[in-house]
């Protein structure tokens, strides 16, 4: 393929990879996101993968990034426009430059629970280990610390945008603003009581409050967007699903949920509801471009 041929032309030299994280302007308080910490910059690399057009690998190219965080140009190192001659330059020989990666699903604060209970069936893992641990430990400080650690790990390995779904989403959003990472903050809804809310109704009420808190253009310009996050078909009732669908349409935000994650989930759903989880959501009108389904390993 074109991609394989281009990559082959890189030769056998060892290379490093740089991920290009585009900061965006904001009037918020975060020092990491203020314009005084940015400057006009040209990054020259041995290879640039722009993602679009698909399969393209540009050899000996540069990317110009203006101080407001936007890409001002992509051009050959040897043929740079005069407009960029007085910009700061960063030289990356034998290195590959590409856009930041996207973590499309996660629970960042749970980094603090890494290794807490491994290699268990999902139902056992959740009910006997994770949910009891969350009931004991999760609070705003736990979420702030765990999310900060996760963001540090993501940024250090090239992930510059994340989709997060966890309790205390207002804390998650504030932490993302402080660090400068882009994020979709998915507002959790689950029928079980937890440290964030007592029931589905309270989850939805709090979700709407968090949406109002972070819906401004200032937050969107800083890379923060929102979604509803009903946990999964087996942890959310039809009544709550219908309210979530109504609000998501009114507010024009997506819905993000676990679906068809395990074989037992599907078997249990058929036994209890006489239909598979996907069919249940379809019957309620959920299938649309705004639906984000994660895992989907048991179709």
Describe every region a protein language model picked out.
Residues 1, 6-8, 13, 20:
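Intrinsic low-complexity, disordered N-terminal segments enriched in polar/charged/small residues
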Residues 14, 18, 22-83, 96:
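N-terminal metal-binding scaffold of metallo-dependent hydrolase/deaminase domains
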Residues 46, 63, 69, 94, ...:
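Divalent metal-coordination and catalytic microenvironments
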Residues 48, 162-169, 234-235, 296-299:
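Short beta->alpha connector loops
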Residues 96, 114-181, 203-220:
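Alpha-helical scaffold segments that flank or form the walls of functional sites
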Residues 106-108, 167, 261, 298:
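Short, glycine/acidic-enriched loop or turn micro-motifs at the edges of active sites
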């Amino acid at each position: 393929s074109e991609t394989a041929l281009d990559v082959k032309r890189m030769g056998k030299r060892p290379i490093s990879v740089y991920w290009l994280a585009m900061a965006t302007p904001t009037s918020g308080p975060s020092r990491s996101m203020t314009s005084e910490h940015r400057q006009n910059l040209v990054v020259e690399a041995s290879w640039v993968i722009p993602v679009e057009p698909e399969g393209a690998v540009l050899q000996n190219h540069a990317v110009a990034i203006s101080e407001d965080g936007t890409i001002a140009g992509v051009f050959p190192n040897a043929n740079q426009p005069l407009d960029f001659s007085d910009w700061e330059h960063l030289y990356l020989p034998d290195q590959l430059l590409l856009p930041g990666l996207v973590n499309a699903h996660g629970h960042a604060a749970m980094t603090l629970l890494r290794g807490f209970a491994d290699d268990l069936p999902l139902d056992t893992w959740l009910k006997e280990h994770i949910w009891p641990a969350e009931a004991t430990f999760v609070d705003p400080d736990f979420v702030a610390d765990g999310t900060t650690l996760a963001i540090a790990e993501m940024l250090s390995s090239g992930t510059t945008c994340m989709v997060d779904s966890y309790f205390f989403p207002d804390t998650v959003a504030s932490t993302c603003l402080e660090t400068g990472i882009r994020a979709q903050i998915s507002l959790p809804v689950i029928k079980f009581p937890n440290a964030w809310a007592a029931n589905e109704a309270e989850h939805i009420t709090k979700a709407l409050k968090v949406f109002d808190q972070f819906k401004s253009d200032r937050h969107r310009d800083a890379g923060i967007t929102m979604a509803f996050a009903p946990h999964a078909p087996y942890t959310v009732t039809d009544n709550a699903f219908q309210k979530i669908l109504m609000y998501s349409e009114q507010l024009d935000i997506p819905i993000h949920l676990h679906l068809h994650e395990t074989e037992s989930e599907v078997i249990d759903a058929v036994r209890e509801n006489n239909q598979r989880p996907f069919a249940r959501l379809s019957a309620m009108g959920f299938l649309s471009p705004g639906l984000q389904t994660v895992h989907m390993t048991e179709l």
